[in-house]
Amino acid sequence: MLASTFSYRMYKTALILAALLGSGQAQQVGTSQAEVHPSMTWQSCTAGGSCTTNNGKVVIDANWRWVHKVGDYTNCYTGNTWDTTICPDDATCASNCALEGANYESTYGVTASGNSLRLNFVTTSQQKNIGSRLYMMKDDSTYEMFKLLNQEFTFDVDVSNLPCGLNGALYFVAMDADGGMSKYPTNKAGAKYGTGYCDSQCPRDLKFINGQANVEGWQPSSNDANAGTGNHGSCCAEMDIWEANSISTAFTPHPCDTPGQVMCTGDACGGTYSSDRYGGTCDPDGCDFNSFRQGNKTFYGPGMTVDTKSKFTVVTQFITDDGTSSGTLKEIKRFYVQNGKVIPNSESTWTGVSGNSITTEYCTAQKSLFQDQNVFEKHGGLEGMGAALAQGMVLVMSLWDDHSANMLWLDSNYPTTASSTTPGVARGTCDISSGVPADVEANHPDAYVVYSNIKVGPIGSTFNSGGSNPGGGTTTTTTTQPTTTTTTAGNPGGTGVAQHYGQCGGIGWTGPTTCASPYTCQKLNDYYSQCL
């Protein structure tokens, strides 16, 4: 509680200071390259199975952009080092430097088409670009804010070209909808230029935070030619829907004492970028579900139950205690759909850690068995994660390699000095020598990930639980509105009988209430029962 209160006071102080600085010392916008956001559609669905297509856009994060002196082409930042003549301190740097528009395909390897977004790993133009991080936008100056309590989030993904050491991550963070522009008048770039990022690691590698540069105390990275760390970090709650390559995957909630964006200082930030990992106000570890780590070593991967050699659908459900969007988050469930078949998440096989979803009971038992610090509970657990989901979060789609731990925490044995037979150590089949960024960048420059077919709606509305079509079993009709398309999902219960994992009851449910043999209708809450 003390940490939470302290963070809130720091946050309010930062707001006041930013306002006092005025527009004379501002994070500027360049004029050399027009910023044109690639279009990407996604769908919002209703309980009846009707889905409306939204014409969204994506924007690349400010950290990837060219930063140059206002009025000419002199770099403010080259490689992993600031020009201290232009940038002697945070405020002066923000006043002197501008973020430039992006050429998405040729510079960053980002291509969008319809409901699909492809992110290439290495792209070489005038400079070599590694990976990318993009946000879904509502319009050209505002991020789309997703509120997922009592909802499910569904998307298709192709990870077939992601080897060991890479992470195609799709997740949510509690950024400000305008990128912090209204809170911090010195931020003149805003969401249009991808500002305002934060996550549960309280990253200190950001070049700009709260409308100021992060040059003070900046230390160039010893193993990343493009990055470094400054005195400040940017914290907020994070819901990792999907962190994956073709070998391993995990989904992980990360709560914070204050759900929204808060600036931190030095090692008090905690997380990956600080000497005291658990010294901050966020949970850097989260409560993860990695099927391999939970004991099922044949569930996810090439040729396995979820076959990563081809595209599949990922369904994540955020279930509340009362079945409403104002309830308390009590469970995060996961399903997959591939080749017309609904695949439930694998069960944990460890004695004492049961289930195939994230609950408070699962997290407590898992942390105990794996001998991990229960920082998840300390920072609010599922209730804390639910607070962030309730206020709205920004969708992030990214591809990255790991200069801190070579992604071994996702796809190999970690820590590498521990025995692979120790509970929680083995996370995938990748060798402990794999994932070194220099090696991955040299050997797999053609790696890529594709995200597509994003749908959001009430539990059971975004995919066909009867299992006839991995895309949701929908038929499409065009409405008279020029910017929307309405689709209607096929009946998840078939001909009067709900199939495995289909809805079979709940307040307001008018579909089938009988389950196909041998399944029975089990009540999850007053509003949703499911064939299990």
From Swiss-Prot:
Residues 462-496 are annotated as: Thr-rich linker. GO terms for biological process: cellulose catabolic process; glucan catabolic process. It holds the Pfam family Glyco_hydro_7. Residues 496-532 form the CBM1 domain. Residues 475-490 have a biased composition (Low complexity). Residues 27-461 are annotated as: Catalytic. It is found in: Secreted. Residues 1-26 form the signal peptide. Induction: Expressed at high levels in the presence of carboxymethylcellulose and repressed in the presence of glucose. Keywords: Carbohydrate metabolism, Cellulose degradation, Disulfide bond, Glycoprotein, Glycosidase, Hydrolase, Polysaccharide degradation, Secreted, Signal. Its EC number is 3.2.1.91. SMART domains: fCBD. The keyword Methyltransferase does not apply. It comes from the Eukaryota. InterPro entries: CBD_sf, Cellulose-bd_dom_fun, ConA-like_dom_sf, Glyco_hydro_7, Glyco_hydro_7_sf. GO terms for cellular component: extracellular region. Disulfide bonds join 504-521, 515-531. Residues 462-495 are annotated as: Disordered. The keyword Transmembrane does not apply. The active site is at 238 (nucleophile), 243 (proton donor). Glycans are attached at residue 296. The biological conversion of cellulose to glucose generally requires three types of hydrolytic enzymes: (1) Endoglucanases which cut internal beta-1,4-glucosidic bonds; (2) Exocellobiohydrolases that cut the disaccharide cellobiose from the non-reducing end of the cellulose polymer chain; (3) Beta-1,4-glucosidases which hydrolyze the cellobiose and other short cello-oligosaccharides to glucose. Belongs to the glycosyl hydrolase 7 (cellulase C) family. This is Probable 1,4-beta-D-glucan cellobiohydrolase B.
